[in-house]
Amino acid sequence: MSTPARKRLMRDFKRLQQDPPAGISGAPQDNNIMLWNAVIFGPDDTPWDGGTFKLSLQFSEDYPNKPPTVRFVSRMFHPNIYADGSICLDILQNQWSPIYDVAAILTSIQSLLCDPNPNSPANSEAARMYSESKREYNRRVRDVVEQSWTAD
């Protein structure tokens, strides 16, 4: 069944295949265009460098008028990522706009990795460490990066 949301997701997927932004990839699951798996690679020259972080994106029939539910499947240590993997990012909540596509969502999340907002913490320990002890924070991030290599 073709709906506006499904047509838009097909367009997003096509664009992602034809012009993939650096360091991200994503695709719908084989039998469900409304559920995507994605990977964000840790940006070079950052504590996240070398990491491979898996996410899931769940779209509703209201897409693109409503944002998807996005979660990290990989374990993360970041001021704006909750323990369950959900992400505190303005464009996924109150700043959502239908102009955002899957590539824009994933690129924004990749940027958030390196540029957290400690004023809106989802993980208070990570936010405190990021603000008070950058060295210790970076060490914890490196641990998460190393775990990303062996996690399923």
From Swiss-Prot:
Mutating residue 88 to S: effect?
A: Stabilization of the ester bond with the ubiquitin
Reactions listed under catalytic activity:
S-ubiquitinyl-[E1 ubiquitin-activating enzyme]-L-cysteine + [E2 ubiquitin-conjugating enzyme]-L-cysteine = [E1 ubiquitin-activating enzyme]-L-cysteine + S-ubiquitinyl-[E2 ubiquitin-conjugating enzyme]-L-cysteine
Q: What would you give as a GO molecular function for this chain, any one?
A: ubiquitin-protein transferase activity
Q: What SMART domains does the record tag this protein with?
A: UBCc
Top-tier EC class: transferase
For this protein, what is the EC number?
2.3.2.23
> Origin organism of this chain?
Arabidopsis thaliana
State the family named in the UniProt similarity comment for this chain. Answer: Belongs to the ubiquitin-conjugating enzyme family.
Protein name (record) = Ubiquitin-conjugating enzyme E2 1
Q: Name one Pfam family in it.
A: UQ_con
